[in-house]
């Protein structure tokens, strides 16, 4: 019995080791470089931690995605391939205020607009809430976050808290607001999605 347990443990250990040591950093190189592909994702995170699923895309519906740590809500990461047939050129999404994923400069789920404004070095623009692109940062206004080391782009989306009041309607709709807008600050939106990808 002991021998069987030992064999099972040894068989699982590579996947466990990868799960424990694989990074949770969103950067323009390594696993998520422009030339990355499905094989590289599997090599870095382990086959046991990588699955193919269908996810919901706003305004599109269900799309195919490669999911890393699909059973772990905090470490779950969704990868959509720009070259779907070859599964190359990743578009990567970390969702949720409690996501373990962070960018190299420390941007993580749950951050406030003030937190991101500080990292950007100046106010940025984001769309109003209550529509498909609600809360999406539309322009970093030439701030520090406008360009990423390595050349990929950074996408950020904010969400209002569940208990938000009538003040939400002052910053809703298909129009842009500054992160420094007093009505936007009053809503206290939090960062719920971080995206990195490539324009071409």
Where on the chain are the PLM-derived regions?
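Positively charged n-region of N-terminal signal peptides that target proteins for export
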Residues: 1-4
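N-terminal signal peptide c-region/cleavage motif recognized by signal peptidases
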Residues: 12-14
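Short helix/turn-capping signatures at newly exposed starts of structured segments
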Residues: 18-133, 137-153, 157-200
């Amino acid at each position: 019995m002991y021998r069987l347990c030992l064999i099972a443990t040894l068989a699982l250990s590579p996947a466990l080791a990868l799960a424990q040591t694989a990074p949770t950093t969103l950067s323009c190189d390594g696993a998520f470089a422009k030339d990355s592909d499905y094989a590289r994702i599997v090599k870095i995170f382990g086959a046991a931690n990588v699955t193919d699923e269908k996810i919901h895309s706003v305004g599109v519906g269900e799309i195919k995605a490669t999911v890393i740590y699909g059973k772990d809500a905090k470490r779950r990461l969704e990868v959509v391939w720009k070259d779907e047939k070859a599964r190359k050129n990743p578009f990567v999404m970390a969702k949720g205020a409690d996501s373990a994923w962070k960018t190299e400069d420390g941007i993580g789920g749950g951050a406030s607009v003030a937190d991101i404004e500080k990292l950007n070095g100046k106010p940025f623009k984001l769309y109003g809430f209550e529509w498909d692109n609600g809360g999406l940062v539309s322009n970093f206004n030439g701030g520090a976050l406008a360009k990423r080391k390595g050349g990929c782009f950074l996408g950020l989306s904010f969400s209002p808290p569940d208990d938000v009041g009538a003040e939400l309607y002052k910053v809703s709709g298909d129009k842009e607001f500054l992160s420094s807008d007093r009505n936007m600050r009053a809503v206290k939106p939090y960062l719920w999605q971080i995206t990195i990808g490539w324009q071409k």
